[in-house]
A protein has these predicted regions:
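Alpha-helical transmembrane segments in inner-membrane proteins
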Residues: 1-352
Length: 352
């Protein structure tokens, strides 16, 4: 009975977070260069659902265009990317048993960045179609994930420390190659695109893009949620897991590959946005503890709320100018992480 009541309380907490996410979406819809009253937003949403017209259809009014074509796609993308990066942070930290781990430290984001940089400045993969930059970013993340797994398996079976070291080494290599390409590139327009992309932006979100990204990120998060028992065993270590009948070797590899899928699409859609996968799990673990059955859904919802609110702030902090979201996240994330590092130990949910 006590566990049942405990589960009911946790479900209520998730419901509260879901409501907060909806409220943050509504708030972010209303702010910007053009402020929209709540009534106008409600009318635009209701009209779209009752009219039966395609979202992209012209002649539906300026409020409809602002809500459905400009703001709502980017806010949904912000929620998806925030949830995906926060969830990947949880997974990375479990894989290497280190709360400082995130997709960046294991080289996945750097691989995606190298792929996108090669596509934009060198035209690599242009034959793949108009979305070749995104495809190149995903391929870069996926290839680096495979390389991390390959290197960590050299000289015997991989473990969390070998994965961490392999990821850090490959991250440095990808960064060096990206810098090399940028340094010798003679493409001013491409350089501007890279600079803007490296700072992170959600402005280019499209409904067609969301139709591809949303199922992948949501399905991956739900899959990881079903793996809570294995993720909890990873915190105990390989020897303890083996005595309990679970070999973690294959699980680590699959989790890393699925995480690369999320990160590849996130980097393709929103550019380089750091700290979400590092800060959000670190903070949430203080409240939920290390149990991934609770940690994962809370981290996903909080990550979504965090990025939606950040995107809203980016549009109003500087009048008539949109601040790149990666800059704002770094300005918030870096001092927050330093504070957490001083106040808390690096244990999974532990404190001084």
């Amino acid at each position: 009975m006590k566990n049942y009541l405990k589960d009911i309380g946790f479900a209520a907490f998730l419901l509260v977070l879901a409501v907060l996410l909806l409220l943050s979406l509504f708030w972010a819809l209303s702010i910007g260069t053009v402020k929209l009253p709540a009534g106008d937003i409600y009318d635009a949403v209701l009209h779209q659902f009752t009219s039966g017209m395609p979202i992209e259809a012209t002649g539906q009014g300026p409020v409809h265009d602002i809500v459905w074509l400009l703001r709502l796609p980017r806010l949904i993308l912000a929620a998806l990317v925030g949830a995906g990066l926060a969830s990947c942070g949880v997974i990375m930290q479990a894989i290497v048993k280190n709360p400082l781990a995130d997709p960046y430290i294991l080289g996945i984001s750097s691989g995606a960045s190298l792929g996108a940089t090669s596509a934009i400045l060198l035209g690599v993969g242009a034959a793949l179609g108009p979305n070749f930059v995104g495809i190149a970013a995903f391929i870069g993340a996926f290839v680096i994930s495979l390389a991390v797994l390959f290197i960590s398996n050299l000289g015997g079976r991989s473990n969390s420390m070998k994965l961490l070291l392999a990821g850090m080494a490959l991250s440095a290599v990808c960064g060096a190659f990206s810098s090399f390409i940028v340094y010798f590139a003679n493409n001013k327009e491409g350089m501007q695109t890279i600079a803007y992309w490296m700072m992170g932006s959600l402005a280019g979100a499209q409904w067609g893009e969301l139709a591809v990204i949303a199922p992948i990120i949501v399905a991956s998060i739900l899959f990881f949620w079903t793996q809570s028992r294995v993720l909890n065993l990873m915190l105990l270590g390989d020897e303890s897991a083996i005595t309990m009948g679970t070999d973690l070797h294959a699980y680590r590899q699959w989790y890393l590959l699925i995480s690369s899928l999320i990160v590849g699409f996130a980097v393709y859609s929103a550019g380089m946005i750091g700290f979400v996968g590092l800060i959000v799990p670190h903070v949430i673990r203080m409240f939920t503890g290390p149990d991934h059955k609770r940690l994962l859904p809370v981290a996903a919802l909080v990550g979504a709320i965090f990025l939606v609110v950040a995107d809203g702030l980016c549009r109003v902090i500087i009048p008539h100018t949109e601040l790149p979201i990666g800059i704002l996240i770094s300005m918030i994330g870096a001092p927050s992480f330093i504070y957490l590092m001083i106040k808390k130990t690096y244990g999974f949910g532990g404190s001084d």
